[in-house]
Structures are given as C-alpha cells and as structure tokens.
Design a protein with these regions (language model features):
Chain B
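Signature of N-terminal electron-transfer/Fe-S-associated modules in redox systems
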Residues: 1-180
C-alpha cells in the first residue's frame, strides 16, 4: 500500500493567512490545491513535506470573474473550467486544453493553479521509491545523475501541464501572492528551462489567479489546441500544440505557436510564428510554416513513445493544429 | 515524525460519523480502515485507475487523492450507500442482470462514476458514457457489457422496461451450417 508520509496539515481560511504560514514554514512546506499531483508525488516519495498547507478553504482563490478580461481563481477545478461559459465561448481552445487533462474523475479534483504548477515528469522520476532506489535515484530527487542524458549537468524532465502552452499562446498572466505582497507576471515568465527548478516563482509565492486578456478572446484570435498521447481517455501528453493567430484582411498579423510536453517548459516555436506572419492562411503557407517546428522540438527519451518519432510527427501535428485554427479542418484529437 | 491525529465528523452515506485518524490519511484509507466501508477499492492509489471512485457532493472523485481531514461538511457517498432501503440502484440491477463484471474489482468505482453521470444526464449517449468512465480502468470485461449496463441502468432509472439483450448474455447464435 502506498501511504502518504506523515506531515502536519494547516488549513488556512484566507489568502493572507496561507501566505503567512508558507513564509513562516519555509521551503520544507508544500502547498496543496486539488492534490492530484502532490499526493502521488508524496506517496512515491518523489517529494517531501514536513507541513502541507491546504488552499481548499481560501475563498479568495475561487471563482471566475468575466469582464473585459477573464480572471480565473487558482482553486477553480478543471471540471468547472472546461465547462465555464466564459471559457467555452471566449477561449474555446483553453477549455479544450483543460478538458484534455487526465480523466473526468481527476478533473473533478484537480485545479487550474495546480496544473500551472504541475511537477515536471520523466520515466526515471515518476516511479515508486523501490524502483528509483534500484537505479540509485536521479538528479531530480536524491540522485546525482540524469539517466536520460548521463553526461548532462541539468535535468531534462518534461513540463506536461496541458493548460500551460495554451495560456502562453493566449498571452495570459498569473497573479502570485506572498506575505511580501502580490505581483502579476506573464505565464510565459513563470516557467524555466530546467527540469528541477522549473518554476520562476519564489517558494513563498502562491499562484492566486490566472488572467486572460480581452484581446486574446475568440473575437480577436483564431485558436486551436491539440494533444498527442497513447490513450485518449487519460494519458499525459507526449506533444501538445497550442496555436493563437491574429488575422487582418486574410493575412496573419501575429502568431503564437507553443509546444507542450516536449521540453522542461512550454516552448514557443518562434520560427513557425515568423513564417506565418504576413502570409495568408492557406494549405501551402501552413505546411511550409509547420515544417519549421522540427527544429523547435528535440524530444528526449524521457516519456512515452520513441523520441525520434515524436520529433518526426511534430510538424504533422503543428500543421493539423494550424489548419484547425485557420478553419480549414474541424478540430479533432486532444 | 509523530503522526498528527485528526478528529472529524464525516457525512458518509447520509450518516454523520465522528472519527479519529492520522491527518495524512486519505479518504480511501479512512473509509476502509476506520469506517469499515471496504466496498471502495484500493487500486493504483495514484489517480490512474478509478477503482476508489466515490461521490463528494454528488461529484465522482478519486478517494485515494482526497485527504479525509478535508471533507468535513461534504456529502460522501460510497457504493454501500447506492441502494435505497432494500431496493438496488438501477445501475446495480443492470450490472447484476447483465453480468457486467468479471473479477468485480473495478465495479464499485464504475457504479459511482456512472451514478454521477445519470444524476446529471438521465439519457446519456454511448459516447457520453464512455467519456464519463474514461478514468475507470477495467482489465477483464473489455468494457462492452459495462457500457451496455450503464445504458440499461439509465433506462431502468427512467422507468423503462429493460432486459439484457439475449446476445449480450449468451453471445450470438452460431451460423447454421449450409446443407451439403
């Protein structure tokens, strides 16, 4: 049986109290939202926690506020958000990305804030204690070596949060709260290209809210999301593609193409975006631009499927996602 | 670390039960170990298999990923609380009549996930049933009878007369050999 390790539980009833407890406890404390990522990681002893601070009773983190921009409380469940009218009508590709996370029974617990902070994943890390001990662990937890790239000085674990690439493509912002105050940064600036130190937020900061700009909604952008995985019913992705295109007079004036589940952070495929800008959304221009995604994707042997194959199919799925955003094909997959 | 003990009043199957348990124990552990409700099964314990599914305020959730100390004030329903008095829940009837279980280990979780679906959507399509059960793994049946049984349970719950199709129970008749 996989029991959780013993910890002290704190259940604050306001954001200020949660921040105060977190700064007082220091980095040995962990914050829990839905628990769908932290509990498995604690059960497998991937992570440690002397104190767990639950955000379940913090009222400031609940709710969807839709005005010009749409602000999503970090404790909103994935199940509520995939059906939230403000997302379904104005940010449909984000609703789709959120709906592609794991399974319905998990989305009833998992939260947006938790997904945004999802721990990076790797074949050599997402294993139980005994399995990892048998290989003397890896550098992400307790070991010294990266088994994916043994001569590498860094960890290559993959960022698989499905909301992340879409939030980056939509130019979303995240509000971070701490006892020292609050700040709002682009979601793109929340992630670092490192499998271990993968979030740019400080350990005493809590993800409080995600803000979607009015200029990124369906009235302004053509968007699409695609997720490649072994089983459509539940699995983590091995590649996701988030696309947001602005067009004027039939030509692309701005483009964001962000790849997920392929590196330690949601990776912008800048070459693809540059190739699209100024071009009409035709079969030919989309195919030519999608070909340039091959360079942005260098999958490692750290998740499901052959890494070479994942690299080879990246342009195929970038092309399909661009075609869906352009309205040339119906969106499918995910 | 000396485990911290929590004392909470949990509402399980309509009954308020005050229980003491280690604060780091999951709802699954407290249901089975403190409350003796072993109908909810222990599977992967990582949120991947769905056999520990229970209802929390009417929503199907994975009890292996919920801390028992957090559910005070929430309405928990397990497979033991599915029937009403001596009447089986329509899904329990359809699963039993059709034989939609083999080893049966996934059945409690599937009944709970399916009951949440029917409460929200009394006439789900096959695609909606499949989507609602996407997080519930079955390694025996191949899912065919489970999907049929959920549709049968939905029909019974709507007050319709439902019988398992003979070919679902006995298989299709063998082809008659041609006369030589």
């Amino acid at each position: 049986m996989l029991r959780l390790p013993a910890f002290r539980l704190r259940q604050p009833t306001s954001l200020a109290e949660a921040c105060r407890i977190l700064s007082g406890e220091g980095p040995a404390a962990r914050v829990v939202a839905g628990g769908t990522d932290l509990w498995p990681n604690l059960k497998r002893r991937n992570q440690k926690a002397s104190t767990v601070i639950s955000l379940a009773r913090v009222p400031e983190l609940a709710g969807v506020r839709a005005g010009g921009e749409v602000r999503l409380g970090a404790m909103e469940t994935l199940a509520d958000l995939e059906r939230a009218p403000a997302l379904v009508t104005r940010y449909p590709a984000l609703a789709r990305a959120i709906g592609s996370i794991s399974s319905p029974v998990l989305r009833n617990l998992g939260t947006l804030g938790g997904n945004v902070c999802l721990d990076t994943r790797c074949t050599y890390y997402d294993q139980n204690e005994e399995w990892r001990r048998s290989i003397h662990y890896c550098m992400k937890a307790e070991g010294r070596i990266c088994w994916v790239a043994p001569s590498s000085p860094r960890c290559w674990a993959v960022q698989s949060a499905d909301s992340a690439p879409m939030l980056v493509a939509l130019d979303a912002r995240v509000r971070l709260a701490s006892s020292a105050g609050e700040r709002e940064i682009p979601v793109a600036a929340l992630y670092r290209d490192d499998g271990i130190d993968y979030l740019a937020k400080r350990p005493d900061e809590i993800v409080a809210e995600v803000a979607l700009p009015a200029e990124s909604d369906a009235a302004h952008l053509r968007t699409a999301f695609f997720k490649l995985r072994r089983r459509g019913s539940i699995d983590f992705g091995v590649l996701s593609v988030a696309v947001a295109l602005r067009t004027e007079g039939g030509r692309v004036t701005d483009a964001r193409v962000v790849l997920g589940s392929i590196a330690s952070f949601p990776s912008p495929a800048g070459e693809v975006a540059r190739a699209l800008i100024g071009a009409p959304l035709t079969t030919e221009s989309i195919r030519a631009a999608a070909q340039r995604s091959r360079a942005a994707a260098t999958p490692m042997d750290n998740t499901d499927f052959d890494p070479r194959w994942r690299g080879q199919v990246t342009p195929v799925y970038v092309e399909r996602t661009l075609r869906a955003a352009a309205g040339l094909d119906a969106a499918d997959g995910a | 670390m000396e485990p911290e003990t929590a004392v909470r009043t949990l509402t399980v199957n309509g009954e308020a039960r005050t229980v003491a348990f280690p604060v780091h124990h999951t709802l699954l552990e407290v249901l089975r170990e403190e409350l003796g409700l072993t109908g909810t099964k222990h599977g992967c314990e990582l949120g991947e298999c769905g056999t520990c599914t229970v209802l929390m305020d009417g929503r199907a959730v994975l009890s292996c990923l919920v801390l028992a100390a957090e559910v005070e004030g929430r309405e928990i329903r397990t497979v033991e609380g599915l029937q009403r008095g001596n009447e089986l829940h329509p899904l329990q009837r359809s699963f039993a009549d059709l034989g939609a279980a083999q080893c049966g280990y996934c059945t409690p979780g599937i009944l709970m996930a399916a009951s949440a679906l029917l409460a929200a959507n009394p006439s789900p399509t096959r695609a909606e049933v499949r989507a609602a059960l996407a997080g519930n793994l079955c390694r025996c049946t191949g899912y065919q009878k489970i999907l049929e049984a959920v549709e049968g349970g939905a029909a019974l719950a709507r007050g319709e007369d439902w019988q398992p199709a003979p070919e679902s129970l006995h298989g299709s008749p063998l082809p008659v050999p041609e006369e030589r």
